[in-house]
């Protein structure tokens, strides 16, 4: 089984590395492509992690911490990608202020409509970003509980850590996806040229399948469908089964990435690729097409997580230190004053 999984992982990694190379070779829009490359890296990470977990099943929980952490990071990268796409052509806050209040999607249509302003954007960032922290924390707690034999993977019993951590993770990812959908609905018209739906389904599919696969396998364990075989315990078999399925799925996802995250839209004969200068934190045109700038772009721009730190500071730390931070922001203050002057008072539409 692990040999078949290894072949699938190898194919998925080769397909992904080729697409990553092509994006870095045609790095004409760094602000978008850095997020795209980060998303594409998900396939190699998942493939290697799942194969290692399958090959060394006793250590699978340790390997999964890396995979779970990157899974949450990819969701944040997709949100940042569609924000960056809008900011390329519009002042995002001004655009939000020009729109009508947004109704909640079904089945929450009974809730008050959402006023679109900087506060809405901050809330979207906050709820997407919280998953980036909750997911690895849940993974680490799972690891600690497993070492104490209190995790009980696949056991739907109140006394096991598995049940409670699954609930916490489900709530966290649900909120993250919900606010991602809210932003998408608010910007649906402006995002149409970017064709975000296929890209979003690529991201959501891995979150959906990885989570519900584990739940489905846990039910199989609970009802006795999966039983011990030789030296392999039920936990070993259920973990190996999920890792094997993931290795196969990565081939499909890597192929989908070639359609939905294609580099061709960034291939412009009238533009030369950019290269990132870490010292000045700016991009400059790079007339060369050798491997050096490709490596440089990857290690100095794609792997630079300063945007995560900045968003964390903006959405979590500053509001705690200064509750009036949002209202004191110059753009927000100006827009709020304009809204008070130009818009009729309607308390039901603000949340």
Swiss-Prot record:
Q: Where are the transmembrane segments?
A: 1-21, 39-59, 73-93, 127-147, 162-182, 206-226, 241-261
Q: Please tell me whether the keyword Cell membrane is annotated for this protein.
A: yes
**SMART domains to which the protein is assigned, alphabetical:** Solute_trans_a
Positions of the UniProt region annotated as Disordered: 327-351
Record's InterPro entries? Ostalpha/TMEM184C
Q: Indicate how the chain sits in the lipid bilayer.
A: Multi-pass membrane protein
The family annotation for this protein states: Belongs to the TMEM184 family.
Q: Which gene encodes it?
A: tmem184C
Protein location:
Cell membrane
Instruction: Give any Gene Ontology cellular component.
Output: membrane
Glycosylation is annotated at: 26, 236, 301, 304
Q: What molecular function terms (GO) are annotated for this protein? A: transmembrane transporter activity
In its UniProt entry, what is this protein called? Transmembrane protein 184 homolog DDB_G0279555
What is its biological role?
A: Probable transporter.
Q: Please note every region of biased composition (Acidic residues).
A: 339-351
- Keywords of the record: Cell membrane, Glycoprotein, Membrane, Transmembrane, Transmembrane helix, Transport
**Source organism's superkingdom?**
Eukaryota
The UniProt entry, under PANTHER family, shows: ORGANIC SOLUTE TRANSPORTER-RELATED
């Amino acid at each position: 089984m692990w040999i078949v999984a290894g072949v699938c992982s190898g194919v998925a990694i080769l397909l992904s590395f080729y697409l990553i190379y092509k994006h870095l070779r045609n790095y004409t829009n760094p602000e978008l492509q850095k997020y795209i490359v980060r998303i594409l890296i998900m396939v190699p990470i998942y493939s290697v992690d799942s194969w290692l977990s399958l090959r060394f099943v006793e250590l699978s929980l340790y390997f999964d911490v890396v995979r779970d952490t990157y899974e949450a990071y990819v969701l944040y990268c997709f949100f940042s990608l569609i924000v960056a796409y809008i900011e390329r052509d519009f002042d995002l806050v001004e655009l939000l202020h020009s729109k009508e209040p947004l109704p909640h999607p079904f089945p929450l249509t009974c809730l008050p409509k959402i006023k679109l302003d900087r506060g809405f954007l901050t809330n979207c960032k906050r709820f997407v970003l919280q998953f980036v922290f909750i997911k690895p924390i849940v993974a680490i707690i799972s690891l600690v509980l497993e070492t104490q034999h209190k995790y009980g993977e696949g056991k739907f019993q109140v006394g096991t850590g598995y049940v409670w951590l699954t609930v916490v993770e489900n709530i966290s990812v649900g909120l993250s996806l919900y606010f991602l959908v809210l932003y998408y609905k608010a910007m649906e018209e402006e995002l149409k040229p970017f064709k975000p739906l296929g890209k979003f389904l690529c991201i959501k599919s891995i979150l959906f399948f990885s989570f519900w696969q584990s739940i489905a396998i846990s039910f199989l364990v609970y009802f006795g469908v999966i039983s011990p075989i030789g030296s392999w315990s039920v936990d070993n078999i259920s973990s190996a089964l999920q890792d094997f399925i993931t290795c196969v799925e990565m081939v499909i996802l890597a192929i989908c990435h070639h359609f939905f995250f294609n580099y061709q839209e960034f291939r412009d004969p009238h533009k030369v690729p950019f290269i990132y200068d870490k010292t000045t934190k700016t991009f400059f045109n790079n007339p060369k097409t050798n491997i050096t700038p490709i490596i440089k772009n990857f290690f100095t721009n794609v792997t630079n997580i300063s945007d995560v730190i900045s968003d964390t500071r903006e959405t979590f730390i500053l509001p705690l230190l200064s509750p009036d931070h949002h209202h004191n922001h110059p753009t927000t203050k100006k827009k709020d004053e304009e809204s008070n002057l130009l818009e009729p008072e309607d308390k039901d539409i603000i949340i």
